[in-house]
A protein has these predicted regions:
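Loop-to-transmembrane-helix transition segments
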Residues: 12-20, 64-93, 156-160, 208-229, ...
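Glycine-/small-residue-enriched transmembrane alpha-helix faces in small-molecule transporters
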Residues: 1-41, 138, 142-174, 196, ...
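Transmembrane alpha-helices of multi-pass small-molecule transport proteins
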Residues: 38-89, 116, 164, 185-201
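Helix-helix packing/entry segments at the starts of transmembrane helices
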Residues: 108-112, 177-189, 228-263
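C-terminal transmembrane-helix exit sites in multi-pass transporters
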Residues: 96, 112-132, 255-274
Length: 300
């Protein structure tokens, strides 16, 4: 049988993971406060201030050895450069989507991630899929097709978020680095370009810093904390709970985002969108039930 974590440790881990996903679910409220700032500039700030925050944590933990090792090999740099590009693309589309009135579609992207991860496991890692998993992926594909036919457009925001985050997750799975060191490497590789862009924005008088209210500037400077804190919670929780538990908790974020989109931001959610979501949710239910049954069979 798979060993169970100590009850107290598992409880703390579950709480940390739940807080992480709740944080990610509520974060559209934060980004909406920054809607007046250019999305590309926001991502540049996010890269720079995430690096500052993460480096401070690494310095506190004396974790320089792993960071130097990751930056010292050509393969390590290449792998992390690709993951950096995927992560930055994901951030950019997400922030733009939230601030352009597409919170519901952003939530759809993250509902698709577990099913896309399963598909990537089959196509990239050659993992065998159970029949229920294939049906679940098929349900998601039907949901996307319904969106295309009934709504009249492909949900490109959702698909881009799912593909970039799914691809990023795959690369992180192949990487030996922990979440914190991985984020440090990824931001280190792109922060110089981001910093140069921010300096250019400031020089032209278009940058947010020095040209906006004190509250807005404080929110911009806090992008690093907003990025790194949930990752620290995730890293703490993931080490202390089962992967299946973590998989169930991941639905918190898109569920909260969806709820915000419908209630707080009052975005349109018509019957055609409801039908598309219904197919995807059905796939997720099937996927989750199948995983739980498989876990019981393995640990019996």
């Amino acid at each position: 049988m798979t060993p169970l974590p100590a009850p107290a440790e598992a409880a703390r881990g579950a709480l940390a993971a739940a807080l992480c996903y709740l944080f990610w679910g509520l974060v559209p409220l934060y980004w909406r406060q920054l809607a007046v700032v250019d999305a590309v500039e926001l991502i540049a700030h996010r890269l720079v201030w995430s690096l500052v925050f993460v480096m401070a944590v690494i310095f506190y933990r004396a974790g320089w050895k792993e960071l130097r090792a990751a930056l010292g090999t050509r393969r390590g740099v290449g792998l992390n450069l690709l993951s950096s590009a995927l992560l930055t693309g994901n951030w950019l589309v997400y922030v733009w989507g939230v601030n352009s009135g597409h919170v519901i579609e952003c939530s759809l992207g993250y509902f698709l991630v577990p099913l896309l991860n399963t598909a990537l496991g089959r196509w990239v890692l050659r993992e065998r899929l159970r029949p229920a998993q294939l049906v679940a992926i098929g349900c998601a594909a039907v949901g996307v097709a319904v969106q295309l036919v009934q709504v009249g457009r492909l949900p490109w925001i959702a698909l881009t978020l799912a593909v970039t985050f799914g691809g990023y997750g795959l690369l992180r799975k192949l990487s030996p680095l922990g979440p914190l060191t991985g984020l440090a490497v990824e931001t280190t590789l792109l922060a110089p370009a981001a910093a140069a862009f921010l300096l250019w924005r400031q020089h032209t008088g278009e940058g947010a810093l020095g040209h906006a209210s004190a509250t807005l500037q404080a929110l911009v400077l806090s992008t690093g904390v907003v990025t790194a804190v949930p990752l620290l919670l995730f890293a703490y929780g993931a080490r202390r709970i089962r992967l299946t538990t973590l998989g169930l908790l991941q639905y918190i974020a898109p569920t909260v985002q969806f709820t915000l989109g419908v209630t707080v931001f009052q975005e349109t959610f018509d019957r055609h969108q409801a039908l598309a979501f219904a197919f995807i949710w059905a796939g997720l239910v099937l996927y989750t039930v199948d995983n739980l049954r498989n876990l019981r069979a393995v640990t019996r």
